[in-house]
Structures are given as C-alpha cells and as structure tokens.
Amino acid sequence: MSQSPHVTVLGAGLAGTEAAWQVARAGVAVTLVEMRPIRRSPAHHSSDFAELVCSNSFGALSSDRAAGLLQEELRRLGSLVIGTADTHAVPAGGALAVDRGRYSAALTEALDQHPLVTIERREQQNLPPENAITVLATGPLTSEPLAEDLRQFTGRADCHFFDAASPIVHGDSIDLSVAFRASRYDKGDADYINCPMDKEQYLAFRQALLEAEQAELKDFDKNDATFFEGCLPIEELARRGEDTMRYGPLKPIGLWDPRWGDVNDRDVRRAKRAYAVVQLRQEDKDGRLWNLVGFQTNLKWGEQKRVLQMIPGLGQAEFVRFGVMHRNTFLESPQLLQPTLQFRQRPNLLAAGQITGTEGYAAAVAGGWLAGTNAARLALGLEPIDLPATCMSGALTHFVSEAPTAKFQPMPPNFGLLPDLPERIRDKRARYGAYRDRALQDLEPMRALQPETVTA
C-alpha cells in the first residue's frame, strides 16, 4: 500500500510558516520542525512562529512600489502570512506594519489548529533522507550542526552578512512637548513620532555614536564584517560621513511640527525646519511601544541608552528592547537552486526565505509560498511551477537561481529585477504602474492553482 503524501518543513519563520500552510492547504500532511524554545537563536525573543526579529514593517503598501507589489501578489496567491499581517496591521503611514506579538501568536495558532499540520519542537541537525520531500526554511540563523551538514551536501561554504535590530521604547516615556506626531509629506494619519534635531544636536549625536563602545560579535572574523546595505547599523552610517544619516534614516524632508508656524511661509520654513529628524514607528496595536526607525545597532546596551537618550524627546526614554546584531547565513543559490526553488542535485529538497539570498520579510514569504506550493505538488505527483519573471515574486526566485555567482549578495524586491517593458515610459510613477499592471496580469494563471484564501 502506498504511503500518504507528506512534506517536512524545517524552520517556522516567515518562509517556513507560509510553506507549511501552503502544503496543508493543498491537502498534504506536513510536519513543521522548529527548534525554539528547545534551542534559542541570537536574535529571537519568543517561541512563536514568524517572529519579526528586526523591524515590524513589511515595507510600502502601495502596489506601485516594489515591496507593495510583492505584498499584493502574495495576497492574490492566498498567502496566510500576508493576510494575517493585514489583519494585525498598526498605523504606519504608507507602510504595512504589524503588532508583532499578536501577529506571530495568530500564525502560531493557525498552524497549531490545522488538522494536517504536525508541529515538532526540536533541533534538526541533519538534512532528512533523500526520498523525503523537504522545505529548508531555517533562515539566516540556521543552527551550526544543520549548517555544517548543508555545507557537506552542497560542497560549498555558506555566505554571510551581519544584520541588526532596532531598539524599542515605551511610548509614554517619549516627551511630546519636544517630539511631534506626523507622517512624511502628511501621508497617513500622523502615524510616526518625530524627534527633531538642530545642527548642533545632530553633530553631537553623531560624535557620540562614533565614540560609543560596540558589543563584541561572536564567532566571526572581525576583518570580514560584511553588512547588508539595506540594514546598516546606525553607527556604521555615522562613520561613513557627516551627512550620511541626514540623507538616510534621519532625513528631515517632508516633516513639519505645526507648533513651528506656517509651513507655507518660506521665511518661517527656513528658520524653523529641523536639521535632522529621528522617527519612531508604532510597534503594537495599542501604541504603547515604539521602535526607532533605521536604528539598527551593535552598541553595548549601556551605550545605547546613553547615546539614544541624547535624541530630543527621548531624554527619559524607557527601553523595552535594545538593538542587537547577529550573523546571517545564506546559500550561494545561483550554483544550487532552480527557479522552482528545488536543489539541482536533489529535487525533493527545496529552499525558501532569507537562506536563499532574498532580503526582506515579504521576499521570505514569497519564497515560502513557492517552495510550499511546489513541495505539495511533488508530493501529489504533479510538476512544480515556475513563477513568471515579470512578477516581483518570480523575479526574486529567478534572481537567486540565475544571478552571476561572483560576490552573490542578498537582494530585496526592486523594479530593477523585472524585465524591460515593451515601451519606454519616462515618468517613473507611470513606469512603476505599468510594471505592476503587467505583473498582476501575468500572475493570474497562478491563482487558479490555489484554494480559498484564509487568514489567522
């Protein structure tokens, strides 16, 4: 008698959570293996699935932005992880941000209650047997025994970079007589808290960052500290130049406190506008917790408190969580993976998420969707699917499987990954809109493969 179809998913981060759900939705039994809380990672704080360890934001909502287009594609494909993000969204201007505690708890409960999902809390130290259909979604913090087995299997050393998380403060400890609520260019409903700096305050703050003591990074060569450019520590930005932070996370443009006067008065605007602005984004549904946007850091915790309390409005800030830095591991995917996310040398083994070399939450979810869908199809005796390269989700999987291998580095969603449009469109907004329209149209055949959308 033939065995019932079955898939194993290793890792219950964003990619693994999505992959396990897609397998179960296809009617295939799935075992989801997660090492937390048996073994903790350097960056996680809970044992819930799909824990967001860096920001609580999935990026821009608008579908004429790269991150927003990817989110919209995933909604149309029936993504549990993105649908649940919509359910547990918190105000964030034009971005999709979530109450991370409630969000992860809802996803954990959804999988725990699904009759086709078996959850095993243990550390997987080896790749499963070759005949077992498996999704590898252990993420950039894959435990060392499994990482070593993966190196033996691929015959290649893994790649790595260093990532960091931002601090979080209690909202009621922010001084709103100094800080003010607003969204950049008044987009949204004043969803951010903004801490303005004059030039003297900014320069003193930068100097303090440069002089602050950093925490020691363990288990790596200090001469090979590669950072991901999209998530640089704030102290690294400070080192790169006097104005680097002002043109990055501390840019003041588009932010105005009505207490300064009439923004339409040119003289008032010139006299009162901030030299730099630190933004805080709501972290939870109730607005009690706020994270410092773009303030990934590896400073020692005592130094973080000392330096960050120099920010106007944060002089008495109470820190719920300090920033941390950790090593992220990823595969040399162009040498190893097909666009279906199957390993070339073992088609029953698929990879998903940041370990494949994509960057960003939505990109991890997209990889989980495709790997889970294809694992289920393999279990059912069907051919795996390949997403169109004209879609953002497909462009990412084609990139990680087909990119030049020299110095392969993680890639976030961006319109530069998409094939050229048939016609040249000079206006950027119109061009991005055309990319969106083509992507969503080309995605339509994939939607027929999916059952009804469900959210937690």
Swiss-Prot record:
EC number(s) stated in the UniProt entry for this protein: 2.1.1.74
Subcellular location: Cytoplasm
Organism annotation: Synechococcus sp. (strain CC9605)
Reactions catalysed according to its record: uridine(54) in tRNA + (6R)-5,10-methylene-5,6,7,8-tetrahydrofolate + NADH + H(+) = 5-methyluridine(54) in tRNA + (6S)-5,6,7,8-tetrahydrofolate + NAD(+); uridine(54) in tRNA + (6R)-5,10-methylene-5,6,7,8-tetrahydrofolate + NADPH + H(+) = 5-methyluridine(54) in tRNA + (6S)-5,6,7,8-tetrahydrofolate + NADP(+)
Lineage: Bacteria, Bacillati, Cyanobacteriota, Cyanophyceae, Synechococcales
Keywords: Cytoplasm, FAD, Flavoprotein, Methyltransferase, NAD, NADP, Transferase, tRNA processing
Protein name: Methylenetetrahydrofolate--tRNA-(uracil-5-)-methyltransferase TrmFO
Pfam family, one: GIDA
SUPFAM superfamilies: FAD/NAD(P)-binding domain
Any one GO CC term of the record: cytosol
Family recorded in the similarity comment: Belongs to the MnmG family. TrmFO subfamily.
Annotated residues for binding of FAD: G11, A12, G13, L14, A15, G16
GO MF assignments: flavin adenine dinucleotide binding; tRNA (uracil(54)-C5)-methyltransferase activity, 5,10-methylenetetrahydrofolate-dependent
Cofactor list: FAD
